[in-house]
A protein has these predicted regions:
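Non-catalytic helical/linker scaffolds that mediate oligomerization, partner binding
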Residues: 1-339
Length: 339
């Protein structure tokens, strides 16, 4: 049973990395959505000085939609407030000097917005939600269902959106090249929806060093389309990660639980023998400095007995208040529940 720990501000120092590795963390995850080369080099150096052959996972951005990186404003959106979403190409040419009109540019092109029937948009793993109430050739007019702060890079979910042909982004190419050149041996791709998303990575790695033997590629299952296409996805992947942080806003809270266990049952019945990793919302209580809850422990127990082969800790270890304690508890639970 694997433990994957995401490295972030609260776990990037040598002391915490030593505790992680000493307490059975199998894989250290670097989130390339927030790529800081100097920091990543330091983490690799620290980790490999503790354990030379520690496995490192490079988690790529994939087709994740975000607030456009050239958005230079930060503002709060209140409950029941009207906002306007637009594409990155439109935002680059419009001139909005009206502070009373809140425009949120997304990292997609205008043709994607126009060809899709977008009804809902959510952000930050579903903690901010918007209902689309009107659409023209430039904007999606939406109303906020809760409050929160908007800034560049914030992750967005648009359930059922068709992003068109699968293409490896320039950002992912840069991340992949850096990962391979720094001897990272596990790649996980976000927002995989078809086998083409993984085959694109395999082809690109060949152009870097021509050798795929020592590199494992994991697919993150986190959209409705990925769930429908899981058979073709697992056929070309070395393992899958059921990424619940995005699966919940993509599928809905109630449906996402059904989808998780339907997928696990299908994999078990087909004698799937590769890694199945459960990610995010594992021990969220500890992320916020509290003790774990009985429901979290029951969930871990259920997953272990449903055939998963590991857990991926995200915010719990990257920004959580108890990163080492979280790893120690998960290790203890795995030992107890695997019997």
């Amino acid at each position: 049973m694997k433990i994957i720990a995401t490295i972030g501000p609260n776990s990037s120092n040598k002391k915490v990395l030593f505790e992680f590795i000493n307490n059975s963390v199998d894989i250290l995850r670097l989130n390339f959505s927030h790529f800081y080369e100097e920091e990543f080099r330091k983490i690799l150096s620290y980790a490999r000085s503790i354990k030379k052959d520690i496995s490192i996972m490079a988690d790529l951005c994939g087709k994740k939609i975000r607030v456009y990186e050239n958005f230079d404003k930060v503002f709060k959106v209140n409950y029941d407030e009207v906002v306007y979403f637009c594409s990155s190409d439109v935002y680059s040419i419009i001139n909005n000097n009206d502070e009373n009109v809140k425009i949120i540019p997304l990292s997609i092109m205008s043709d994607i917005i126009q060809k899709n029937n977008i009804e809902k948009i959510s952000m930050k793993d579903g903690s901010m939600n918007f209902d689309v109430i009107d659409k023209d050739k430039i904007f999606l007019k939406a109303i906020s269902k809760n409050s929160g702060v908007i800034r560049k890079g914030k992750g967005c979910n648009i359930p059922g959106i068709d992003l068109g042909e699968s293409v490896l982004s320039e950002k992912d190419k840069i991340s992949l090249k850096w990962a391979i050149n720094n001897n990272i041996n596990i790649i996980s791709q976000s927002y995989v929806e078809t086998s083409k998303d993984i085959l694109n990575i395999r082809e690109y790695i060949k152009t870097i060093n021509g050798n795929l033997k020592d590199i494992k590629i994991f697919s993150k299952i986190e959209t409705q389309l990925a769930l429908r296409n899981y058979k073709e996805i697992i056929s070309c992947s070395d393992g899958i990660i059921i990424a619940r942080g995005d699966l919940v806003p993509e599928c809905g809270l109630i449906t996402s639980v059904e989808e998780e266990f339907d997928l696990l049952r299908n994999l078990k019945s087909s004698n799937y023998n590769k890694d199945i990793i459960i990610a995010t919302h594992i021990l969220d209580s500890m992320k916020n400095g509290f003790s774990s809850t009985i429901s979290e422990l029951e969930s871990i127990y259920t997953f272990i007995n449903s055939g998963v082969t590991g857990f991926l800790l995200a915010g719990e270890t990257s920004v959580g208040k108890k990163p080492v304690e979280t790893v120690k508890l998960l290790k203890q639970l795995i030992r107890a529940y695997e019997k």
